[in-house]
Amino acid sequence: MATLTPRQQQIFDLIRNTIRRTGFPPTRAEIAAEFGFSSPNAAEEHLRALARKGVIELTPGASRGIRLKVSRSDSELPDQFSLPMAGVLQLTLPLVGRVAAGSPILAAEHIDRQYQVDASVFDERPDYLLRVRGLSMRDAGILDGDLLAVRRASEAANGKIVVARLGDDVTVKRLQRRGGHIELIAENPDFTNIIVEPGEEFSLEGIAVGLIRSSGF
């Protein structure tokens, strides 16, 4: 196990705790603000040091592209991307693959398999997992093939990452209400935001409450 400096351990703990609390890693700016660094570049230097020591993995170009590779605690509990251990409370959740146009998201034909996860890694209990397709949410740390933990909901606060149905399509985006309009924000500048036009068929399928990094499942 790599030896971390006290500051590196503090940053590692912040990353781990932020993921456990929100389901997503912090940005460089958030790390800098937490520790009083003069700029996000200082946070980046610490992150690169942690990556060199093999305890995290960085995704280039993604503001939240931080993945825990090991857990560092007295009891050596697994991080939130690990398979569940025996003796801990487990949830069995349906894993949703591709969603056919116009059909319910949890229709039997959409369920790839049942997936067991450690319940303790989520502050809010999810109802299902959705396999992410594409890189439109890359800068939120959500990558192609990842499993997004989703709590079913028909309403969500501004800024929440949601699973939305727009016409026959289902998409993962950040919800933003501007005046009387709804906008679905991509977390990748290569993708265009979606503006929900008045009268367009739109509904929320759920709110993201966590993430499981893809490991070939």
Swiss-Prot record:
Catalytic residues of the enzyme: S136, K173
Pfam families recorded: LexA_DNA_bind, Peptidase_S24
Species this protein is from: Cupriavidus taiwanensis (strain DSM 17343 / BCRC 17206 / CCUG 44338 / CIP 107171 / LMG 19424 / R1)
Quaternary assembly: Homodimer.
Enzyme class: hydrolase
GO annotation, biological process: DNA repair; DNA replication; negative regulation of DNA-templated transcription; proteolysis; SOS response
MF annotations from Gene Ontology: DNA binding; serine-type endopeptidase activity
Protein name, per record: LexA repressor
Enzyme Commission code: 3.4.21.88
Superkingdom of the organism of origin: Bacteria
Keywords, comma-separated and alphabetical: Autocatalytic cleavage, DNA damage, DNA repair, DNA replication, DNA-binding, Hydrolase, Repressor, SOS response, Transcription, Transcription regulation
Signal peptide coordinates: none
Gene: lexA
Family membership: Belongs to the peptidase S24 family.
InterPro entries for the chain: LexA, LexA-like, LexA/Signal_pep-like_sf, LexA_DNA-bd_dom, LexA_repressor, Peptidase_S24_LexA, Peptidase_S24_S26A/B/C, WH-like_DNA-bd_sf
